[in-house]
Structures are given as C-alpha cells and as structure tokens.
Amino acid sequence: MAKHASGKNNYRLSGELIALLVVLALIAAAVIWWLSSRGDDAGSTEAKAEECVAGELVLPVAASDKGAGQSLVDAYGDSAPVVRDYCVKPQLVDSVADAAVFVAPNTAVTHQSLESAGRTPAVSDPKAAYSEAVGVAGKDEVKLEDLTVDKVRFPVSEESAASALVASQVAGNDNDAVQALTDQRIGSADELNADGGEYLATAEDAVPEGLKFTPVGADAVYTAFPLNQNDKVDENQARAGQDFARFASERFDGTANDQPAVSDLVWAAALPAGGEAIT
C-alpha cells in the first residue's frame, strides 16, 4: 500500500532539539560565569594576602583638628594601602609623641610644637593636604560688617585653627585677636549661648546641629607632616607615614595660599594651653 504524506512538519523534532541545546548552553554559560567570578574573588583575596605577607601595621596619626585628621585617615584607609608588605591601618591618636604623622597648619607654632614634643619632620618640604572653610555659627546668619569679635566664642581645644583664623579676620589686628582668644575661649561648642547672640568660631564641616554658618573669607589649610621614628614609632610606621603624606597631598586640590597670613602670636594664643605654651 502506498504511503501518503501526513502534512506535519518533518523538522519538528530537530527544532525541539535545538531549543533544548540552547537552554543547556545558557545554563552552562551561567555556571561558568559563576565559577569564574568566584575564582576572581578568591584570586583577589589571595593576591591581597600575598601583598600583606608581613601582616598589618597600625599607622598612628595625630592632628591639631580631629575633623581634618579623621577625614584624611578615612580616605587613606579606604585606599587599602600596602607599605613594605604590610597592610597599613591608619588610626587617629591624641599625642604627637605617639604619631608617625602630624596633621596641622604649616606655621612656626606647629614647628615649635613638634620640637617641644621631641619630634622632627621626615621631609624638608611637607605638602598641604587638606583645607576647610572657617567662619562663625550662630542662631542666625550674620553680615560680616555687623560681626564684632566680642560676640565670638573660641573652642580652642576642639578647633584651634578655626579659632585663630576667625579671631584674626574679625578682630582686624593682632592685639585684639589675642585678647579675644584669651578671654573668650570656651571648653566646647556646648558652652555657646547662641540665644544670647554669641557666635562660635568653627570650620564649616563642624557646625553644630541647629546653628547657621557664616564664612569669614578664610580657609584653614592643613599639612601632613611625616615624622621620623622614635621609641614609640618604628621604621616601618615612619615609612608608612611618608606614604600617608604623599597620598594626602596628591589628592589635595587646593593650595597653601588659601589660608591667609596670621601672626605667630595669634596662632599661639589659639592653642589649648594658650600662648605661654610656646616660647
């Protein structure tokens, strides 16, 4: 008996097979990608471990302004620095005597402070590394022509540089600035009587909540001073301190000229211990 055509697609089975093969190929590709990504993560972890064959190294950083110092510490730490096969872990410390880096304005008073602490810079030309606008904070903004120095309070223990710059800018002469820094210093921003019309000398980044900031046309510029080793800072930490200073200065997009000239008498009067601490 002769066979007759059924009218069905003779390639139906081949089409289903192709679809199945495509699905299998996609699954295989996904598995390969997953395994590859796991391998990359493992490889980067292993590479990091190989870079840090010497382990971790704590880098102590002191700063005349905690906000400026912490900003630089955070930025350097986020870069995952490796120095001499150590994974460097920067942290802020209170004492210059314990530090491998000192962050402070590059002034004669700062150099005298280092000398008094028995520390010496590891480089002859330390670079500017950070800046912040300074001004006053109060219940309301104030016009500079209406701002007199007797209305300003200076939290020298927390913000020495801002206090010096604001006093110099607002007082207009060194004698009045020194007198204000001596007589109108406060222990902290909490002591400010904003409702009584007082204004706080502060960096813009440190304005207390609820107060309004008015700039006085000056920036505080901080230099990262890498320090030589001593009995508390070893050679590896000193070398890491130099890397910290290099990193900070390369990221800094301002100049030392952003900070107006302020006399040494005013800088000294803005120290927490007052001008008598520096001779």
Question: Predicted regions: what is each one?
Answer:
Residues 2-42, 53, 81, 229-279:
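Extracellular/periplasmic juxtamembrane helices and adjacent flexible linkers that interface
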Residues 2-11, 21-31, 40-159, 189-209:
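N-terminal segment of the mature folded domain
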Residues 67-68, 156-176:
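Bilobed "Venus flytrap"/periplasmic-binding protein-like clamshell domains
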Residues 78-88, 170-181, 253:
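Structural alpha-beta junctions
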Residues 126-135, 209-242, 269-276:
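Periplasmic-binding protein-like
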Residues 138-140, 144, 170-175, 248, ...:
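Short, well-ordered alpha-helical segments in soluble proteins
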Residues 167-226:
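Ligand-binding pocket segment of bilobal, Venus flytrap-like solute-binding proteins
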